[in-house]
Amino acid sequence: MELRARGWWLLCAAAALVACARGDPASKSRSCGEVRQIYGAKGFSLSDVPQAEISGEHLRICPQGYTCCTSEMEENLANRSHAELETALRDSSRVLQAMLATQLRSFDDHFQHLLNDSERTLQATFPGAFGELYTQNARAFRDLYSELRLYYRGANLHLEETLAEFWARLLERLFKQLHPQLLLPDDYLDCLGKQAEALRPFGEAPRELRLRATRAFVAARSFVQGLGVASDVVRKVAQVPLGPECSRAVMKLVYCAHCLGVPGARPCPDYCRNVLKGCLANQADLDAEWRNLLDSMVLITDKFWGTSGVESVIGSVHTWLAEAINALQDNRDTLTAKVIQGCGNPKVNPQGPGPEEKRRRGKLAPRERPPSGTLEKLVSEAKAQLRDVQDFWISLPGTLCSEKMALSTASDDRCWNGMARGRYLPEVMGDGLANQINNPEVEVDITKPDMTIRQQIMQLKIMTNRLRSAYNGNDVDFQDASDDGSGSGSGDGCLDDLCSRKVSRKSSSSRTPLTHALPGLSEQEGQKTSAASCPQPPTFLLPLLLFLALTVARPRWR
C-alpha cells in the first residue's frame, strides 16, 4: 500500500512538472501578431517571429515562460536596447556639451573683444598722441598684446614676467629716443635697467597694470578654461561603454515584456531607476567634484567686477600704457639726472640730431566699459545654467527613465517589474558605485571602478584647485587640463575604501521571487503569466521521474 501511494505521488509530481513545463494548451496557441508588428517596426525580419507562442527554454535573459521570442530575436532586441540606451546617454551629454560650448564661446568672444578693442584704440590714438615714441616702437606694443592673448588662451606664460620684460625693453628704446644726442651702449642700458625698479621711470602705471591685469586675466582665462574642461569631461564620460551586466538588465527592462506576451506593460518607475543606477554607478561618482567645479566657476565671476575686474582691466590696457609714456616724459629731466648719477656720464653722439623735438603728451581716453549690461547678462545666464546642471550625474538615471523609457503611469500593480505585470517591491538604490552593492537588477563589482571616469574626476579636482587659486589672484601654471592622465589611482583600479571590502554577490538568476510580487490577475491575464510564474525543470528530469514512479509502483501492478 505504501509503495502504491508513493508511486501515485511521484506520478502526480511528474504530471505537474510536465504541465508546468509545457503550459496550458490554450496559451500555447496564442498569437504573436502584436509582437510581430513591434519587431518589424524596428527593422528586423519578420521571418524570425513565430506565428504563435513557443516554449521559452532557449531564452537567456528573459524569464523562460511561453514566449514570442526566438533566441535570435532575444539577441537582436538585447543589442537594440543596448544601442538605444547608449544613444540616449549621448543625446543627454550632447545637450550639456552644447550648453557649455555656447557659454564658452560667448565669454571667450566677449573677453577677446575687450582686448581687441583696447589694441585698436591704441593703434588709432597713439600715433597722433606720441608720434615717433609710438611709431618706432609699434612692434613692441603689438607683441605685448599678442602675449596677453596667448596668456589668456592658456599658454604657459608668467604674466608678471611678461609685463616686466615689456617695460624693460620699452624703457631702453624710449630712453634712447628721448636722448638722441647721447651715445648709449649696451652696458649703459644694462645699468639703466638695473636701476629701473628704484627709479620708477613710468610712474605707478606698471605696478597698477601688473596687479590688476594679473587678477583680471587669471579670472577670465580660468573661467573659460573651466567651461572647456567641464565640456571635455562630459564628452569623455559619454564614450564609456556599458558593461554586459548592464546590457542584460536593460534588455530585461525594455523588451522582455514583449517576449512574454505583454508588450503593453511599461516598466515600473522604481524598477527602471534601479537598472539605470546600476548601469550608471560610476558616472554618479562624478557628482561631488562636478559640483565643486561649478561652484568655483560661479564664485570666480565675482572677480569680473570692480576696478580690478575683467571688464575694467582687459578693455583698458592702452590707458595704462599711455599713462606710462606720459610719466616718462614728465619725469625725463629728473630721471636723466639720476641715471647719470648711478651709471656715469654717457658720451655725446657727434652725429646726433639738432635741437630737441617738442614733447608730445598723449591725452588719456576715459576707461570706457563695453555696452552696459553685456557681461552682466552673460554672467546671469551662466550662473542659472550652471546651477541647473549641478545634479546632472546623479539625476541622469531618473531623467533617462522619465524621458526615454516610457515608464508606466498605471497603478503599481499593473507595470512591468522584470518578471511579469505586478508591483515592484525592492527599494531604490542610492547614488554612486558603493551604493550598488545590493542592487537587485544589475550585478555591479564595486571594487572595480571605471578608470576613465576616475581620470575625469581627477581632472575636475585639478581645475577646481586652479579656479580657487585664481579667485585669490594667484597666477597658476595652466597646463592642458583635458589631457588624459594615468598617474591617479592605484594600478588595480581600486579605491582604498572599496578594495578592502570583499563582496559575495548572488547572480540575477538566484534572486528570490518575493522581490517581484504578483497581484491578483484576471483570468485572461493569469493565462498569459502562468507560464512565466512557473519554474522550469530541466527537461531530462521528466522521464527520470516517470521511470522512478513506474519502478516504485511495479510490485503492486504485478
From Swiss-Prot:
GO cellular component entries: cell surface; collagen-containing extracellular matrix; cytosol; endosome; extracellular exosome; extracellular matrix; extracellular region; extracellular space
Post-translational modification: S-nitrosylated in a Cu(2+)-dependent manner. Nitric acid (NO) is released from the nitrosylated cysteines by ascorbate or by some other reducing agent, in a Cu(2+) or Zn(2+) dependent manner. This free nitric oxide is then capable of cleaving the heparan sulfate side chains. N- and O-glycosylated. N-glycosylation is mainly of the complex type containing sialic acid. O-glycosylated with heparan sulfate. The heparan sulfate chains can be cleaved either by the action of heparanase or, degraded by a deaminative process that uses nitric oxide (NO) released from the S-nitrosylated cysteines. This process is triggered by ascorbate, or by some other reducing agent, in a Cu(2+)- or Zn(2+) dependent manner. Cu(2+) ions are provided by ceruloproteins such as APP, PRNP or CP which associate with GCP1 in intracellular compartments or lipid rafts.
Biased composition (Basic and acidic residues): 355-370
Gene Ontology MF terms in the entry: copper ion binding; fibroblast growth factor binding; laminin binding
Lipid positions (GPI-anchor amidated serine): 530
InterPro entries found in the cross-reference section: Glypican (IPR001863), Glypican_CS (IPR019803)
Pfam families referenced in this protein's UniProt entry, alphabetically: Glypican
Compartments, record wording: Cell membrane; Endosome
Region Disordered, annotated ranges: 341-374, 505-534
Glycosylated sites: 79, 116, 486, 488, 490
Annotated membrane topology: Lipid-anchor; GPI-anchor
Similarity-based family: Belongs to the glypican family.
Functional description taken from the UniProt entry: Cell surface proteoglycan that bears heparan sulfate. Binds, via the heparan sulfate side chains, alpha-4 (V) collagen and participates in Schwann cell myelination. May act as a catalyst in increasing the rate of conversion of prion protein PRPN(C) to PRNP(Sc) via associating (via the heparan sulfate side chains) with both forms of PRPN, targeting them to lipid rafts and facilitating their interaction. Required for proper skeletal muscle differentiation by sequestering FGF2 in lipid rafts preventing its binding to receptors (FGFRs) and inhibiting the FGF-mediated signaling.
Protein name per UniProt: Glypican-1
Gene source species: Homo sapiens
Taxon lineage: Eukaryota, Metazoa, Chordata, Craniata, Vertebrata
